[in-house]
């Protein structure tokens, strides 16, 4: 009869030939860079799609339609941020189990994560669809763009189960050190999305509804590709027999990681909604400028975000292997990468911000271009604060202290609410531009001592 030890040995042998990467050995800088690069390229590609999407909407439908999509962005961050954060949290125990070479427990986490995600996706979708109109009213969406914003947002909410699916399965693939395949799936999805944008917006004349439908269909494709790859090339993740059972302990651990991370994004999203609401009250021009600048900002800042994502998997695997020395070295190397990239962004944004903004709107919209360029330049000065935030936050998450990372989201929310209540009324658009920098700095004031405390605690535990 086959013993559990035999099963583990067979699984370990399969892991060596599967499309996985052990981040507990080798140069930390090389491992982090190797893992982060496909993530960065994938998200740059995804953000470039958003840039193209905004250009199509802004130039062929109009500034009003662009503002309608932008008015929905902070609400989308609130809801989709919860989905993304929860699924990222579910991947942490998977990464830790993989690092510890406990593959049976890893698959038990996978099975229970799928159950939890299905329930969460259903509940979040129903609540979002029910309260969509009321939320748009609460954030002071201008009347002239309300209808388009409502249609676009409803279509995005209908795709929440697909968002959950892609983030769950791609997160599990990345937990095993493979960031390449999700990158390839994003390429395919983005190309399909752009083609559908052209067909549905320009060809069929569906307006912002066409943009929403295109996103829905491309997300469905990305989920199918993830499932296909896991079944064909990463069977190490597929639960078998008793590994499919419901497990209270594993479910509790998954929720303890996923819910705080999901809430962290949503709490941050509340602050962004407050800032969006204050900006909406300044009129359609400021809404369009905010939309334009945010699209370009995400194109640049996704690099910081994905260095952080790499750190979550890196720290999770090394914690499982009890290699805290590598965690410290990895964090230092990630900060070096972040600072090098900041210099690159400054060289591009400071001289060329106005030109970038003209990609979105006609040259006659000088006020929109000027305001958006101002937003980009102010934010760029504080990119090191953002880079430090993402590295420390995701490292803390990967080490299993998701509650602390959630508190950093609370710090961001408090900062953005304060800016919305005091700086925006006093400084108007300049106050809006200061929203992100103030939030990033306030989160760092919390995360720096929190990360040092987590390190000391885990090193003491490792010596016992």
Regions found by a protein language model. Give the residues of each.
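Transmembrane helical elements of multi-pass membrane transporters/channels
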Residues: 34-53, 155, 189, 218-222, ...
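Helix-terminus/linker motif at the lipid-water interface of multi-pass membrane proteins
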Residues: 48-67, 136-143, 199-206, 266-299, ...
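Short alpha-helical transmembrane segments in multi-pass integral membrane proteins
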Residues: 1-36, 94-159, 203-259, 315-382, ...
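Interfacial/gating helices of multi-pass transporter permease domains
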Residues: 57-77, 143-148, 208-209, 250-257, ...
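Residue-level signal for short hydrophobic patches within transmembrane helices
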Residues: 25, 29-48, 52, 75-82, ...
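Hydrophobic transmembrane alpha-helices of multi-pass small-molecule transporters
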Residues: 78-81, 125, 193-198, 223-227, ...
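Short runs within selected transmembrane alpha-helices of multi-pass transporters and secretion channels
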Residues: 87, 155-174, 182-190, 211-224, ...
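Small-residue-rich hydrophobic transmembrane alpha-helices
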Residues: 66-126, 163-182, 289-353, 386-408
